[in-house]
Amino acid sequence: MKPFYITTAIDYANGSPHLGHAYEKVLTDVIARFRRQLGDKVHFLTGTDEHGQKVQASARARGIAPQAFVDAVSQEFRDLLPRLDVRPDDFIRTTELRHQRVVRELLQRLYDQGEIYRAEYRGFYSTRQEQFLQEKDRNPDGTWPELFGEVTEITEANYFFRLRKHQDWLVSFLQSHEGYVFPAFRQSQVLEFLKEPLNDLCISRPRERLEWGIPLPFDDQYVTYVWFDALVNYYSAVVDRPGIWPADYHVIGKDILVPPHAVYWLIMLHAAGIELPRGIIAHGWWLQRGAKMSKSTGNALNPLDLVDQFGADAFRYFLMREMNVGQDSDFTPEQFLVRYNSELANNLGNLVNRTLNMTTRFAGGTVPTAEAAEEPETALRELWAQTGPDVVALGERFQFHTALERTMAFVTATNAYVERRAPWKLGKSADPADQARLRTALATMAEALRLAVAAMQHVIPGTAAKVNAVLGHRPGAVWREELVWGGRLAGNAVAPALVLFPRPEKPAVA
């Protein structure tokens, strides 16, 4: 069976990772883990984009060779992954020979087919975005948007890829593949963009202006445009491993959906006769008090500051709980602390402590067998009978924020159940019926805790492993079975305590 192949965008090796980079990696890792739990074999790719004018300029400014510069930056991105408990199967760099070979082969194929031609171009160029601009890119007052940085007018001969030739095909493809881009409104934005005629894509830069790139195979006086180079990574990483391509999903930011991924990439593949990816997930931006968080605006947050203070699982939980995939979301230290304290420490952490403490205190540290389920137990089981299937269905639609909300509601209900049953009171009673209720309550608490962490293990894997360990539980291979209420923990010895989410000694970073 073909592996479920999922990719992040590769990160541009021109600066340090920020919250947006971390979110994309965590989101993709959560999807990959979720699919593995469903029984799929998964191939998860990430990496770094290492060519282009900005890299060349940054290296020169530091007085070092471009390769040395990208080696250091790429390692910084690579080092981020284990800190976030993100576990890709492959990490590709566009300076690797395996990638450069495939880029050159693809360029030669398109050139031989007449899809690439040489022509003189006169127009405006953005160094920051490393792209040629059109008049429609201007602001209404005639100025250039700030995102383009310095814009200069140039005249030079270059090689162009025939985008416009395939525009009608792309429109037809998207119209006949509803839901190809997630969320659906992003696909509508792509089709809206395609209502205007496409310009052919300049896919080269003269070596006299840019040396740091992959030379064109048919003219070594030019190097490849960084976007054409970078997009090929998804294919070059697996082309020598039959059965993995096509990608099932590219997970990218909304800012690189149009035109790079939804126009350039799809047309490049179509023109070359290569099967298209099966879908694109375009996530939103993290804002900080309403402003986009990015390197260029200077308000980018270092994700490792949060990980160092609160741990990878708390960070992963917040990202998945707070952002609806595809929408923008605002990050504030205050909101992070609210989620951390109210949901992780006070809700989940409290249930863990109660379960371990009371099992140790009233049952000698061994999970009892549930005996006579009464209305409180039945109500909690009925709630889980709705919650468990919802977690799976929501995950299949990438609605992890809602799945976490439902799971935490179940944890809240379990804590309310504990208050209602009051094991500390039942433990003082000599009535055999109360002793049976006590044993049933302790078994119910432990089982509810096991189910809750099973439902969140793709988001908070470290926490799930710790909780299972203190419950003496080794999860089975079939995740759906782990989500079924049962008496799996009866007879297990539990640890007396586990501190999962300690109170922070200082506020979250600003």
Task: Describe each PLM feature range.
Residues 1-46, 98-102, 146-361, 405-407:
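Structured secondary-structure scaffolds
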Residues 124-129, 284-286, 335-336, 370-375, ...:
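A glycine-rich phosphate-binding loop feature that marks nucleotide/adenosyl-phosphate handling sites
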Residues 328-333, 385-393:
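Short, charged/polar, low-complexity loop and linker segments
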Residues 345, 349, 381, 385, ...:
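Generic structural concept
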